[in-house]
Structure formats: C-alpha cells, structure tokens
Amino acid sequence: MGGKWSKSSVIGWPAVRERMRRAEPAADGVGAASRDLEKHGAITSSNTAANNAACAWLEAQEEEKVGFPVTPQVPLRPMTYKAAVDLSHFLKEKGGLEGLIHSQRRQDILDLWIYHTQGYFPDWQNYTPGPGIRYPLTFGWCYKLVPVEPDKVEEANKGENTSLLHPVSLHGMDDPEREVLEWRFDSRLAFHHVARELHPEYFKNC
C-alpha cells in the first residue's frame, strides 16, 4: 500500500537521513545565519538582508560583479570546527594568508571565495575588538590579526613604488583602532578558544 511517500518508494532516504544525523555542529562563534543553517538546514526568515549584516553584505556582492560567481557551487552550510581547522592548515600550506596585511576588502574576497567553493556562509570570520591582537571568534580558525610594528609600516611606505591603495599604505583606515594588522597563523587556536575566554559576552547565545 502506500502512496508516493511510502517507505519503499523513497529511494535513497536512509542515506540522506544518515548524512543528516552525522552532520557536524556549527563551530562556536559563527553568526546567526550559520546557526539557522545548523538548526534548520536553511536560512530562515529571521535572518534576512534587512536584519542580518552578513545576509545584506552577501546580497550586495551578488549585485556587484566580483570576478567569480558568488552563488555557491556546493550545498550551503555553517562553518564547523573541523572545517575551520582544515581550511586554516590548507591556507598555511599554500602560503595564502601568513603575513598578509589585513583589509576589509581582502577579508571579503576570502569570505566570498570560501562561500563559493566550499559553501560556508560568510558570517564566521569575525575577531575580538582591539587594540592589540584580534583573536578569531570562530573556534578552529587558526588565524589571528596581529598589529604590524609602526617602523615596519614606515619602512614599507618608503620609496617611489609604494601603492597608495595597498592596505599597508592606508595606515589602518579599515580598523577602528587605526592599527595596521596582518593575518598570523597560530596552531594553538585549534585547541585554545582565546576569544571565548577574553569575551564570554559574545558567546551567550551559542
């Protein structure tokens, strides 16, 4: 008996159910939209461009041509602890971020690339406030933002070949504390959630 949804007619359901059961939880420190993805498997109406900064930012990127499609080519999902650790080590191995001067534009490009290629919703790369070292809020992300010594900033800005638009030449204009920051890999961040210890108030709803 049974109609269209009888157990025997739903081919592949046991595999889907098992995949859902084994889905990893979202990492501590991800944003509200990623929590929706974890809990409901989709972004709900409680997180829209009108009330969620990450959703609004993503919508703006879709309207602007950024050089590659911003619709993910894989299923949308929240950043997990394991994925954050794996991504950190992948970027370290490829020489991607270590010592690179941080700017909001560079962070946006990285977030979009990860969203497009891996499907991780771009609300996970957030840091503790300054001044000083900024620690990642997402547990498992092993890159912190470290202030560059002022003499190194001055040295980098000497000469005629300096680009005024290079992040090091902007003297921290992106940063509320006006510090020039660089991404720095720290493997201990995979085991020690520094941000949670320094700012427990950010994790009340996690």
UniProtKB/Swiss-Prot annotation:
GO BP: negative regulation of glycoprotein biosynthetic process; regulation of calcium-mediated signaling; symbiont-mediated suppression of host antigen processing and presentation of peptide antigen via MHC class I; symbiont-mediated suppression of host antigen processing and presentation of peptide antigen via MHC class II; symbiont-mediated suppression of host apoptosis; symbiont-mediated suppression of host autophagy; symbiont-mediated suppression of host innate immune response; viral life cycle
The organism of origin for this protein: Human immunodeficiency virus type 1 group M subtype B (isolate BH10) (HIV-1)
UniProt site (Cleavage): 57-58
Q: How does it assemble?
A: Monomer; cytosolic form. Homodimer; membrane bound form. Interacts with Nef associated p21-activated kinase (PAK2); this interaction activates PAK2. Associates with the Nef-MHC-I-AP1 complex; this complex is required for MHC-I internalization. Interacts (via C-terminus) with host PI3-kinase. Interacts with host PACS1; this interaction seems to be weak. Interacts with host PACS2. Interacts with host LCK and MAPK3; these interactions inhibit the kinase activity of the latter. Interacts with host ATP6V1H; this interaction may play a role in CD4 endocytosis.
Q: Where is this site: Might play a role in AP-1 recruitment to the Nef-MHC-I complex?
A: 20
Question: Where on this chain is Diacidic (motif)?
Answer: 174-175
PTM-bearing positions, type Phosphoserine = 6
Q: Which GO terms describe its molecular function?
A: ATPase binding; CD4 receptor binding; GTP binding; MHC class I protein binding; protein kinase binding; SH3 domain binding; signaling receptor binding; thioesterase binding
The protein's matches in HAMAP family, at most eight in alphabetical order, are given as:
NEF_HIV
Xref: SUPFAM superfamilies:
Regulatory factor Nef
Q: Where is the lipid attached (N-myristoyl glycine)?
A: 2
Q: Where is this motif: Dileucine internalization motif?
A: 164-165
Family membership noted in the UniProt record: Belongs to the lentivirus primate group Nef protein family.
Chief subcellular location: host cell
Q: Where is this region: Mediates dimerization, Nef-PTE1 interaction?
A: 108-124
User: Which stretch carries the motif PxxP?
Assistant: 72-75
Report what the Swiss-Prot or TrEMBL entry states about this protein's PTMs: The virion-associated Nef proteins are cleaved by the viral protease to release the soluble C-terminal core protein. Nef is probably cleaved concomitantly with viral structural proteins on maturation of virus particles.
Please quote what the entry notes about the protein's domains.
The N-terminal domain is composed of the N-myristoyl glycine and of a cluster of positively charged amino acids. It is required for inner plasma membrane targeting of Nef and virion incorporation, and thereby for infectivity. This domain is also involved in binding to TP53. The SH3-binding domain constituted of PxxP motifs mediates binding to several Src family proteins thereby regulating their tyrosine kinase activity. The same motifs also mediates the association with MAPK3, PI3-kinase and TCR-zeta.
Name of the protein this chain belongs to: Protein Nef
Please tell me what else the database record remarks about this protein: HIV-1 lineages are divided in three main groups, M (for Major), O (for Outlier), and N (for New, or Non-M, Non-O). The vast majority of strains found worldwide belong to the group M. Group O seems to be endemic to and largely confined to Cameroon and neighboring countries in West Central Africa, where these viruses represent a small minority of HIV-1 strains. The group N is represented by a limited number of isolates from Cameroonian persons. The group M is further subdivided in 9 clades or subtypes (A to D, F to H, J and K).
Where are the residues of the annotated region SH3-binding? 69-78
Compartment(s) where it occurs, according to its Swiss-Prot or TrEMBL record: Host cell membrane; Virion; Secreted; Host Golgi apparatus membrane
According to the record, the residues making up region (Acidic) are 62-65
User: What is the membrane topology noted in the UniProt record heading this document?
Assistant: Lipid-anchor
Binding to ATP6V1H as annotated region, ranges: 148-180
